[in-house]
Design a protein with these regions (language model features):
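Walker A/P-loop
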Residues: 15
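ATP-dependent small-molecule kinase phosphotransfer cores
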Residues: 37-110
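Hydrophobic anchor at the beta1->P-loop junction of P-loop NTPases
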Residues: 6
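Small-molecule kinase domains that catalyze NTP-dependent phosphoryl transfer to phosphate-bearing small molecules
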Residues: 96, 125-127, 147, 151-196, ...
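ATP-dependent NMP and nucleoside kinases share a basic, alpha-helical "lid"
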Residues: 97-105, 111-147
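The conserved Walker
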Residues: 10
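Short beta-strand-centered segment that lines the nucleotide-binding/catalytic pocket of NTP-utilizing
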Residues: 27-40
């Protein structure tokens, strides 16, 4: 089984790439953000440390962490943000290592895709066989964010300023998936990297 990281800037189209992979190939897709959310729930590895750091004011009526309240608490406090990241990021990485080990032991899938915005910054190269960068020009990304999410230019500017530069992404990635000109071209690039529809091929074999 090959472990492939998928990263890229906001609006690049990672979700479409991952949906295609999950539907067409014998693989599993893990979203690091969703894994982090699970770890932040009551009973998760990050819950108690985060509550101890941020206080009970960030809890909702059911005792869970209200993500909007947490975001508001760290939005203008860089030091607090770093402390939150120091709790969450190592826990996510450990959880991912456990998932990788489990999938390799099962031996049922050909690929495991891990999506995370900070794969480069957090030093995930050591646990990945390849790193894919989903790339779209900034103008294309801005248009997508305005149209699909209703973001203002000011909000887009703030997000882009906090993301890794294109140069850094290009320097660290093994494969670039260009997503400037429609999904059919994206799918052809993926097929070039992975081959034909492996999931369909295996399913047809089992059904015969």
């Amino acid at each position: 089984m090959k472990v492939i990281g998928v990263t890229g800037g906001v609006g690049a189209g990672k979700s479409e790439v991952l949906a295609h992979l999950a539907g067409k190939y014998n693989c599993r897709v893990i979203m690091a953000d969703r894994l982090a959310h699970q770890l932040e729930e009551p009973g998760g590895a990050c819950y108690e440390p985060l509550v101890a750091l941020l206080g009970k004011d960030v809890l909702d009526g059911n005792g869970g962490i209200d993500r909007q309240k947490m975001a508001a608490a760290i939005f203008t406090d860089e030091i607090l943000l770093q402390k939150v990241n120091a709790i969450v990021h190592p826990a996510v990485k450990q959880a991912l290592l456990a998932e990788i080990a489990q999938e390799k032991a099962a031996g049922e899938r050909d690929w495991l895709f891990i999506e995370a915005a900070l794969l480069v910054e957090e030093g995930y190269a050591g646990i990945l066989d390849e790193l894919w960068y989903v790339h779209a020009e900034e103008g294309v990304r801005r248009q997508r964010l305005r149209e699909s999410r209703g973001y203002t230019e000011e909000k887009i500017d703030a997000i882009l300023q906090n993301q890794l530069s294109e140069k850094a992404f290009f320097e660290h990635c093994d494969v670039v998936i260009e997503n400037n000109a429609g999904l059919e071209r994206v799918y052809k690039q993926i097929e070039k990297e992975l081959g034909e529809n492996q999931w369909q091929k295996q399913r047809n074999f089992r059904d015969s």
